[in-house]
Amino acid sequence: MRSSDHMAFAGVLPIVFLLILSSADLAASQSQPGPTNQPYNYGRLSPAMAVIVVILIAALFFMGFFSIYFRHCSGVPDAGVSPAGGARSRATVNAAARGLDVSVVETFPTFLYSDVKTQKLGKGELECAICLNEFEDDETLRLLPKCDHVFHPHCIDAWLEAHVTCPVCRANLAEQVAEGESVEPGGTEPDLELQQVVVNPEPVVTAPVPEQLVTSEVDSRRLPGVPVDLKRVKFSRSHTTGHSVVQPGECTERFTLRLPEDVRKRIMKDWKLNRTNSLLVLPRGGSSRRGKPIDRSRARSDRWLFRKTPSFLWRSRDDGSIRLGATGSVRASAVPNSTGSDSVRAGDRWAFLRNASFLWRNSSVHVPRGGVNKDGEGTSVKSTGASGSTSGSVRLPV
């Protein structure tokens, strides 16, 4: 039982109690014998009884009125509605309570405003109906294909998490998905060609600007007796908080993206193709590049040597060796270039000083055990050969 039913039941109880008391008083008064001079003894309706009857009728009237009102506002289907219609209404109410599914929202296309700015019909600027900001050229738009209204993706996604309608025109997007309609409106290719032949027989009507002018003239010449879309007038637009921020009758063209039919079809087709490609899982292939075999035991010890030593313990010497605190030194001699200069050693020393320790990558530095000289320093390993690929060489990342 709903809260409205509890309130109505609580209001009826005092009235029924007063009615029972008044009935008891009326019965007691009728049981007493009347005066002997009156030939007929008819019971009279006392003023208190009349007031109680009026109050009871008014209470029943208000109970019925509020019951219908609360039932209409809560969206509960009437008893006369068919089971299929009632199930559809309940599904719509449940969908409105939880919003649209993320997979359904992802079917609405997104694109840059600069891609359609020069192709849209009309010269006015577009703006988002939720945040009320005009679109910039580098901003992304999300189009609702059912009503052609555009928004920022983060704005409309947050709205559709709790709603199933368009914030501008209140078009129910859940009904479109439930009925199995296609997201892209329109018929097949032959139907579109037939419509173009029938609707656009004159070259003047095919131009986009006269088409818009004709539409505005038809709307301005609407007769008073012609019914207007009451749902659009009543729910013109709602903000993210739910209250209406656009007055009825206000122009909403600044929220609507009008595109030629061929451009619109191309955008929808490209969006579907991109979504299909994004869902494909490409097989992972092996790399064609092969390196030289590495001694894993030596590599583990080398990695431990370079990773466990902090960067502040490095110190460069003038002879090109690198000292590792009290653990010893790893000396990398410079490789002479074609001019015979010693520029490589200076460059290596600068790299050792300026780069952090975690950026180093050694190829084959091996520190033998027990190698301590008389000065208390570890033995140094010198690189031999012009290529610098033997033990003791240090490679910098490219």
Swiss-Prot record:
Pathway: Protein modification; protein ubiquitination. It is found in: Membrane. It is a single-pass membrane protein. Its main location: membrane. Pfam families: zf-RING_2 (PF13639). Residues 1-29 form the signal peptide. GO terms for molecular function: ubiquitin-protein transferase activity; zinc ion binding. The keyword DNA damage does not apply. It catalyses: S-ubiquitinyl-[E2 ubiquitin-conjugating enzyme]-L-cysteine + [acceptor protein]-L-lysine = [E2 ubiquitin-conjugating enzyme]-L-cysteine + N(6)-ubiquitinyl-[acceptor protein]-L-lysine. It is an enzyme of class 2 (transferase). It comes from the Eukaryota. GO terms for cellular component: plasma membrane. Belongs to the RING-type zinc finger family. ATL subfamily. The RING-type zinc finger domain mediates binding to an E2 ubiquitin-conjugating enzyme. E3 ubiquitin-protein ligase able to catalyze polyubiquitination with ubiquitin-conjugating enzyme E2 UBC8 in vitro. May be involved in the plant C/N response and the early steps of the plant defense signaling pathway. This is E3 ubiquitin-protein ligase ATL6. It comes from Arabidopsis thaliana (Mouse-ear cress).
